[in-house]
């Protein structure tokens, strides 16, 4: 079982324009917020942590981080369980006007999502498994806008109410298809995983009528990792070096939602083996990653443990 937390990253994104509150394309922004949430639904090191900030070009700020993991319970009963928790903050700027003057309205949209998955491993050939997974998600988007002044004080209705203190409750249903190759030998360990995910997000409950939202979250992810022992020992076990390469292609509403259609990640790190001792954690990894895609690039640090 593994649990991965990526703790830092920075990338730059394409510019977008601020919106006008009157006919504000608020619905598009809500769908965009759900699109941002889509990036935190499944374990993916390319979006484990993202920070988009391009204030000079009026690009909405975005910060996102996830914590997730998954494991097959046993070889005898190969049920697979996974879970991901994601947090994001999306800060679009709207413009209110009374026909004569304009006022910028900064907003902060915070979202939290929890996604679970349950699947089953079917052996294909030695070291290769096919894994269908059923996924389910719950999430919330909360808006906090500092709206004041005569320009917007006279404006009433769902749009302004939502910007001031609105919430959007979201659920998601879908699934994933995974091919998982694991070849573990004393001289090296190879992991390769190909995953297609499709989760449909939809708002529900007492949501403002003006901001009903939905998002089609689809992605194809190819993840690979090579681990091999070094000449150094710690805790009576060799310290391993780790090489990692990942490519994620975004589909559906995720494609282009943040200014790119795909992301790549190259990583290098070290792994500490504590399996000789009677402790809960058997391995600990620290991986430095370089992430890049169309018009975006950045770095991150990933921390992971195995049980």
Question: Which functions belong to the PLM regions below?
Answer:
Residues 14-102:
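Short glycine/proline- and aromatic-enriched beta-strand/turn motifs that initiate or cap beta-hairpins
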Residues 51-62, 90-111, 141-170, 201-207, ...:
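Extracellular/periplasm-exposed beta-strand and loop segments of Gram-negative cell-envelope proteins
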Residues 59-67, 77-79, 108-114, 128, ...:
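Residues that define the transmembrane beta-barrel architecture of outer-membrane proteins
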Residues 67-73, 114-122, 175-183, 194-198, ...:
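Residues on the lipid-exposed face of transmembrane beta-strands in outer-membrane beta-barrel proteins
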Residues 71-80, 123-130, 182-190, 230-240, ...:
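Short loop/turn motifs that connect adjacent beta-strands in outer-membrane beta-barrel proteins
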Residues 79-83, 130-136, 173-175, 188-196, ...:
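Transmembrane beta-strands of outer-membrane beta-barrel proteins
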Residues 85-91, 120-122, 136-144, 181-185, ...:
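Transmembrane beta-strands of outer-membrane beta-barrel pores
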Residues 204, 209-307:
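Outer membrane beta-barrel transmembrane domains
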């Amino acid at each position: 079982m593994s649990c991965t937390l990526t703790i830092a990253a920075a990338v730059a994104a394409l510019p977008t324009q601020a919106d006008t509150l009157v006919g504000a394309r608020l619905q598009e922004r809500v769908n965009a917020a759900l699109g941002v949430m889509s990036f935190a639904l499944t374990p993916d090191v390319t979006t484990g942590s993202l920070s988009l900030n391009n204030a000079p070009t009026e690009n909405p700020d975005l910060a996102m981080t996830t914590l997730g993991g998954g494991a097959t319970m046993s070889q005898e009963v190969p049920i697979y369980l996974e879970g991901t928790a994601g947090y994001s903050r999306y800060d679009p700027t709207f413009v209110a006007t009374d026909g004569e003057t304009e006022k910028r309205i900064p907003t902060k949209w915070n979202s939290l999502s929890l996604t679970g998955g349950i699947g089953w491993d079917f052996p294909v050939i030695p070291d290769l498994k096919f894994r269908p997974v059923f996924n389910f998600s719950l999430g919330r988007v909360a808006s906090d806008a500092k709206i004041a002044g005569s320009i917007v004080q006279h404006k009433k209705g769902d749009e302004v109410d939502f910007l001031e203190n609105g919430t959007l409750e979201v659920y998601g249903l879908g699934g994933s298809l995974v091919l998982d190759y694991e070849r573990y030998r004393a001289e090296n360990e190879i992991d390769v995983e190909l995953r297609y995910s499709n989760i449909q997000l939809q708002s529900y409950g007492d949501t403002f009528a003006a901001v009903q939202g939905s998002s089609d979250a689809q992605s194809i992810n190819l993840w690979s990792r090579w681990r091999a022992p070094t000449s150094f020992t710690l805790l009576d076990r060799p310290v391993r070096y780790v090489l990692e390469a990942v490519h994620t292609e975004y589909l559906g509403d995720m494609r282009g939602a943040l200014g790119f259609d795909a992301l790549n990640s190259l990583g290098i790190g070290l792994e500490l083996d504590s399996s000789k001792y009677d402790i809960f954690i058997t391995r600990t990894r620290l991986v430095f990653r370089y992430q890049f895609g169309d018009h975006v690039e950045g770095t991150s640090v990933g921390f992971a443990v195995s049980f």
